[in-house]
Amino acid sequence: MKIALVQTNPVIGDFARNSATVLRWTAEAVKAGCRLAVFPELTLCGYPPQDLLERSDFINAHDRHLSTLTGKITDIGIIIGAIEKRSGSGKPLYNSAFLIDGGGIKARARKQLLPTYDVFDETRYFEPGSESTVACLDGERFGLTVCEDIWFEGRGYRIDPVRNILDTETVSLDFLVNISASPYHHGKINERNAVFSSLCRKNRLPLLYVNQVGGQDSLIFDGRSMVFDPRGVMVASAPGFRENMLIVDSKKWPAAPGLDLPEDSTATVLEALTLGVRDYLHKTGFKTAVIGLSGGIDSAVTAAVACRALGPENVLTVSLPSPYTSRASIDDARELAANLKCGFETISITGAMDAYRETLSPLFQGLAEDVTEQNIQARIRGNLLMALSNKFGHLLLSTGNKSEMAVGYCTLYGDMSGGLAVLSDVPKQMVYALARWLNTKEEIIPERVITRPPTAELKSDQLDQDDLPPYEVLDPILQAYLEEHASIDAICGRGFERKTVEDIVRRIWVNEYKRRQAATGLKVTTKAFGQGRRYPIVQNFQG
């Protein structure tokens, strides 16, 4: 049987668009001679719909479109992820997979393992299914599962949906189908490959895995739909970060040669960020972006990502020099914009600084300058960039990296201003790696931007390392504390100075209020600031 694995890029709540996408790809699968087309988890509404699931009008609209779509599926069978209503005690919905054929629903599988960790909160809305499902089409029998149902190993679940299928079936299965909406983070590709390979070897079953693609708020879904054979060898794979239809034949894949597993590299992170920016703007109705160019590496990489995502003609960059801005920074910003072929403007903030100084002088008389005056500069820049955003309809992209966000080395209502924080989950050392990769074929980012010491240039002779440890020290400590949940003692046991570790941890805690007010940031690590990291602002734990 020829099967199409279709990774789609839905828009949450746009049932008409999502239905049309399913029909378009279904028609392509029919043309290709496929008997079955498989779509991702919650294809019809998009994932994750969050509290839209608590609205009866949302559920009713979903059901109307599902009914209409079902009636139109006559020339091929499809498996599609959708919401299913339920009655009785417990939650009112299932997260289900439907096998539709001949204009009707022939089988359904209800997701049994509901993830409630990091960015996932499915028990808030869904009731877990209680039975495993085997479906049949043209004599071929397959287990039907939804996303987390095949992630039993190492997750602490009490039931194994795949094992339950095999233990209750007296007739052998031909393959296993899993429909997913599995978001990307750096390392996720390798993690998936290990889980899927082990699953297939353990159960001696081929796996057909179909994943959602596209950006949704902070989440980026990478697609990469795959087929693994009973040996645990990947024998077919769709590309990452774009809609695609992968066609496989259930009679041929047992003899298919193994493929090289995809790499999770710096280039992959760049692809993820590019898709995240593109979809965030396009799905929210923005066509253009504006970015403040400091002449530093963070704004340079942000601008490069934006140009890749939107096209340079849709990106405006702005240099906002002050008396503390070096000639090198001004020249590097201009050179970067020329290399990217994007828009470039210069607005001096010196006059605005003078106006602030004069306005505040009666109240500040006799007081020495401190971080207050530095923050005023950042807020002037944020104000001017937001004015350009308002006047011309650009989305302002903020440029701060994860290392700075973690320790509060950023200005609320200043450089934190914006509608999307492109690098807020990218540690500083990874920013450098992205810059190097961008320069692989030609110099996009001026070499001096990469090699000179980072500086905010908010006062004379300022360097980041006047206020922060070197990033090669800071980043590993942040990763250990934020992503691995290591204690201060455990981090010190890795050879880091206790005073440095304690200072970094203190900064993390006291700046929670800043991060709570930050723009939505694109998630590319295992633990990003945002919906997957929930800590109180007011608390007194410093461990």
Provide a role label for each language-model segment.
Residues M1-G292, A303-P312, F344:
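Enzyme catalytic cores with a strong preference for nitrogen-chemistry domains
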